[in-house]
Amino acid sequence: MRILAIEASGPVAGCALWEDGTLTAEYSVQYKKKHSQSLVPMLSEMSGMVDLELSSIDFIAVTKGPGSFTGLRIGAATVKGLGLALDKPVLPVPTVDSLACNLYGTDRLICPLMDARRQQVYTGIYENRDGLKVLRPQCV
């Protein structure tokens, strides 16, 4: 199974290819929050590096928030366009869940934090035994 993942909810824009349980490729840029200008060229360059035909992917995943409102709209619009053009399903993923996946393989509790401003954070608590399990869903 091939999953193309797109992240644009924060200061770093990125795309990745997950293939049969392995991260095959990833590309990220943190440059002045210009996701609208960098996301599609990143996707094109990453696809070229691994000889990926976009028609061969099974799903397209995108972070759905919390995060930058503008970044979320850019990510959603990009993925919606790709999904329609390629006739592929789109999977929205909570941003905090995607952060927790950075520690995939650890046997400890995972508690990612995102700045929600106004002295608050977005967080969740996860356990990673036999797959990522949400113990406490994202909250402020």
Task: Describe the role of every protein-language-model region.
Residues 30-38, 69, 73, 77, ...:
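Residues at secondary-structure transition points
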Residues 43, 78-82, 99-100:
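Buried hydrophobic packing segments
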Residues 48-55, 84-93:
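Phosphate-handling active-site elements
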Residues 22, 34, 89-140:
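Surface "functional belts" at beta-alpha junctions
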Residues 11, 65-66, 116-119:
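Short glycine-rich anion-binding loops that position phosphate/pyrophosphate groups of nucleotides
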Residues 16-18, 74, 124-125:
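Short amphipathic alpha-helical segments
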Residues 59-90:
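DPxDG-like acidic metal-binding loop motif
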Residues 1-64:
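N-terminal beta-alpha supersecondary unit
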